[in-house]
Regions:
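A recurrent domain-boundary module in secreted/ectodomain proteins
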Residues: 43, 420-439
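Bacterial Sec-dependent N-terminal signal peptides
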Residues: 1-23
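Residue-level detector of functionally pivotal "anchor" positions at catalytic/ligand-binding pockets or at interdomain
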Residues: 434-458
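Terminal processing/anchoring signals of secreted or surface-associated proteins
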Residues: 77, 418, 438-443, 459, ...
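N-terminal segments that cap or nucleate solenoid repeat domains
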Residues: 20-91
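C-terminal tail/sorting-segment detector
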Residues: 470-482
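Consensus positions within tandem repeat domains that build extended binding/scaffold surfaces
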Residues: 118-119, 151-154, 174-179, 199-202, ...
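Structural signature of tandem-repeat unit edges
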Residues: 24-28, 52-58, 75-83, 99-113, ...
Length: 482
């Protein structure tokens, strides 16, 4: 038996509790060691007399009998007729103990339309004492269109697998179904209408999976770590999608992420470490931006903060060094630890009147910052850093990482409060004003169409509106189309 070995790594994916529990370190939980391979599975070579192909018609449960003495000799197998769970075990056996590398089931009928759990992954492959997994030879499989479900771990650790098709009637893929299929390649993965859920870690660590993913209008959920470390560059998020799990796209190569308003359940680390991500649109209605949502997205330039957001989670946009100034909405109350740390292209921060808390070092290393506006009449509470003792949300008193001599504009009559408030006393230049930029006033009018309630993007009252311009009405941005 030819053996392909690598050091055994255990990855534990546990579902997080949203809301109260936000401390789980998804990156730590998903971090894996590098694999060490000894030999590759054999490849099919045209004209190779040693390459053994067979064409078999199965009647369900009799595949082993039909293969007979060839079970460990066959390289390529075309299957017609009915295939059941017993036959899938035979196929695994032929690929594990033999050299079966190519399976064509295009004209077969799989019983109940289900690829069973652990179809090509068995505990016999694991040598815990020696710390390795013996891999099967399977390199390519063609599935029939009648497949409706691919169950848990069906192709887990089939590292040699390079090619697989998505059946046209597929509705569900179970947890870890293709986890660690790190040679799997596809220019695109197109999921059919009727497909509703990509479960946990479905394509986790499929590091050669590039190109685009096309989701149908029926998709409801993308599970935790579904594409963790896959290198997909594009995916659509249809209206109707309700949930994106923790670390679902962590370590991918997405260039944009436009999330529909139906997606109200976002997991922590969901888009962490997407090095090419430039644009992100978050859905209206969410009240919290999750921890590490776009952490280390070093190319991110634009993101919106929906008007419904009340808190921005820990490290949400940490190390987004190209991120343009963000509009913080009225209603925002908390900015948590390290949320905007090292967003060094920010030129200004405009804190709304509702802000009452700034977490540890949330605004440190904003080296390009030129001004701060804070509409709150009472200085928001500043949390002291636990890592760098004595550090404020903006930096250390003796080693300022964010400029401390920039103008800080506060409401008339509030400057002295800010000068005496711990954390805010980091700054030396407070200026009282009642002329704040837009997005921090709560604009109220008796009639929403009243000209007295319309402002431009600099916060100035407008008497004559113009087609094609953006204005602030009742605290919201409005594009005037006509």
């Amino acid at each position: 038996m030819k053996i392909l070995q690598f050091f055994l790594v255990f990855i534990t994916f546990t579902m997080s509790t949203y809301g109260q529990q936000t401390d789980a370190d998804i990156v730590g939980r998903l971090k894996t060691n590098s694999y060490k391979y000894s030999i590759k599975a054999p490849k099919a070579i045209d004209g190779n007399s040693d390459f053994n192909s067979m064409d078999i018609t199965s009647h369900g449960g009799d595949l082993a009998k039909l293969l007979g003495d060839n079970i460990y000799k066959v390289d390529s197998l075309v299957i017609r007729g009915t295939v059941d769970d017993v036959d899938f075990h035979t196929l695994w056996d032929a690929s594990f103990n033999g050299k079966l590398s190519v399976i064509n089931m295009e004209n077969a009928e799989v019983k109940n339309g289900i690829i069973p759990e652990d179809a090509f992954w068995h505990s016999e492959q694991v040598n815990i004492k020696e710390g390795y997994i013996t891999l099967i030879h399977l390199r390519r499989i063609i599935l029939p269109n009648g497949i409706k479900r691919i169950e848990d771990s069906a192709f887990s650790y089939v590292v040699n697998l390079e090619d697989i098709n998505i059946p046209s009637e597929l509705q569900y893929i179970g947890p870890s179904a293709f986890e660690q299929c790190e040679n799997l390649k596809a220019d695109s993965l197109v999921f059919p209408e009727g497909f509703e859920k990509l479960d946990r870690a479905v394509f986790a660590s499929c590091t050669r999976l590039t190109g685009k993913v096309v989701l149908p209008s029926t998709i409801k959920e993308i599970g935790e770590a579904a594409f963790w470390r896959a290198k997909i560059s594009s995916i659509n998020f249809p209206e109707g999608l309700e949930k994106i799990g923790d670390a679902a796209f962590s370590g991918c190569r997405l260039e944009e992420a436009y999330l529909p308003n139906s997606c109200q359940d976002l997991g922590i680390f969901a888009f962490h470490l997407n090095l090419k991500l430039k644009e992100m649109h978050l859905p209206d209605g969410i009240e919290r931006i999750p921890n590490n949502l776009a952490d280390a997205c070093i190319s991110l330039c634009h993101v919106n903060i929906p008007s419904s957001v009340k808190s921005i989670g820990k490290e949400a946009f940490q190390n987004c060094g190209l991120l343009n100034d963000v509009d913080l909405p009225l209603g925002l109350e908390r900015i948590e630890k390290d949320a905007f740390q090292s967003c060094n292209t920010f030129s200004q921060l405009v804190f709304p009147a509702t802000l009452n808390f700034l977490g540890e070092e949330c605004c440190t290393y904003l080296t390009g910052l030129k001004r701060i506006y804070c509409m709150a009449s009472e200085p928001p509470v500043c949390e002291v850093s636990k890592l760098n003792i004595g550090y404020t949300p903006f930096g250390g008193y003796d080693s300022p990482s964010t400029p401390n001599d920039i103008p800080v504009y506060v409401p008339v009559g509030a400057a002295e409060k800010y000068r005496k408030a711990w954390g805010w006393d980091y700054f030396t230049n407070f200026i009282e004003t009642d002329d704040f930029p837009t997005a921090i006033y709560d604009v109220t009018t008796e009639h929403s169409d009243s000209k007295s309630g319309i402002y431009d993007l600099n916060g100035r009252k407008v008497t004559d509106t113009q087609k094609g311009h953006i204005y602030i009405m009742n605290g919201k941005k409005v594009f005037l189309a006509r």
